[in-house]
């Protein structure tokens, strides 16, 4: 259910779209933004815990790595080039096109992304190398 309700290419939603309190967009007045902050907003740093769980729960580590790396490709390509310029935003809207918001550069988002990428590289080096080569092709 996490994969279908919470996972996005930019992180995990803080609330399921099925919940009555879900807010898909982080916008409006400061009060409106504050009320949306934990009501569906996507947090990139949660990808670390998600990746840890995949590796723990699945026997097939290459499949876990393929799933996570394939999911987060937009975060590791277009977002890093176009918005964060080498960094990761604090939060994203919970609905496509997953507009970045909050702080332009969030240290714990960057740290968790780097940590889980390193963990995936160790768990499935072949999968990681192919994904990395794909990223290089995309940026050319």
For each of these PLM feature ranges, what is it?
Residues 1-45, 74-140:
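Extended glycan-interaction surfaces of carbohydrate-active proteins
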Residues 53-67:
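Acidic, serine/threonine/proline-rich low-complexity intrinsically disordered regions
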Residues 49-56, 115-119:
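Short glycine/serine- and small hydrophobic-enriched flexible loop segments
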Residues 66-68, 93-94:
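A short linear-motif detector with a strong N-terminal bias
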């Amino acid at each position: 259910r996490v994969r279908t309700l919470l996972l996005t290419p930019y992180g995990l939603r803080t609330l399921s779209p099925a919940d009555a309190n879900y807010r898909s967009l982080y916008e409006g007045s400061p009060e409106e933004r504050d009320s949306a902050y934990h009501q569906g907003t996507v947090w990139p740093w949660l990808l670390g815990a998600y990746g840890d769980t995949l590796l723990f729960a699945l026997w097939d580590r290459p499949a876990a790595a393929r799933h996570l790396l394939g999911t987060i490709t937009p975060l590791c390509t277009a977002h890093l080039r176009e918005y964060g310029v080498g960094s990761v935003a604090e939060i994203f809207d919970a609905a496509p096109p997953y507009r970045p918001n909050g702080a332009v550069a969030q240290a714990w988002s960057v740290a968790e992304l780097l940590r889980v990428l390193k963990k995936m590289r160790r768990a499935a080096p072949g999968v990681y190398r192919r994904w990395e080569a794909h990223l290089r092709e995309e940026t050319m």
